[in-house]
Amino acid sequence: MSHSFIVVMGVSGCGKTTVASELANRLENGVYLEGDSFHPPENKAKMGAGIPLDDSDRWSWFDTLIAEAKTKLAEGQTPVLACSALKQAHRDYLFNGFPAYRLIHLDGSFDLIKARMDARDHEYMTSDLLRSQFAALEVPAPDDNLLTLSIAKTPDELVETAREWLESKS
């Protein structure tokens, strides 16, 4: 499989971390990047206080993610990034300058994702911020570089479907 920049996107609690990390494990030279770990402290503090991020908070974070993905590609790895990438402008910004990229959108209902979030512990993202994420979400338009998956499936089914799709695109 040729090296592409792969982003697993969706609202908080949809399973990005689970799917992206396992997908990276199953890809030859795959490397997992947890987008949340690249947030600057001020973004984490804002979210921890229950304040949704706005676009002015995100651009420097995206620049850090892009730089990390480019480094991994230069090392011969396939970066698999877990990142909300809620708006089309965010996705356009992330993929600008990458000749090969793939987007995997994990899709689920508010009620299902809220129930999952209420059952887990997260450093700063709470189910209270989920409504703002759904409000900000711009569902990606159909595209050859896009795979949309329903999170009603098991994580293993999601990962295997994504892996097979990526192989079919190489």
Q: What do these predicted ranges mean?
A:
Residues F5:
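Walker A (P-loop) ATP-phosphate-binding motif of ABC ATPase nucleotide-binding domains
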Residues V11:
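P-loop (Walker A) phosphate-binding loop of NTP-binding proteins
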Residues S21-T64:
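Conserved substrate/cofactor phosphate-moiety recognition/catalytic segment
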Residues K16:
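Conserved lysine of the Walker
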Residues Y32, L103-H105, L146-T148:
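Conserved beta-strand scaffold positions in the cores of enzyme catalytic domains, especially
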Residues V8:
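Hydrophobic anchor at the beta1->P-loop junction of P-loop NTPases
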Residues A119-T161:
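Small-molecule kinase domains that catalyze NTP-dependent phosphoryl transfer to phosphate-bearing small molecules
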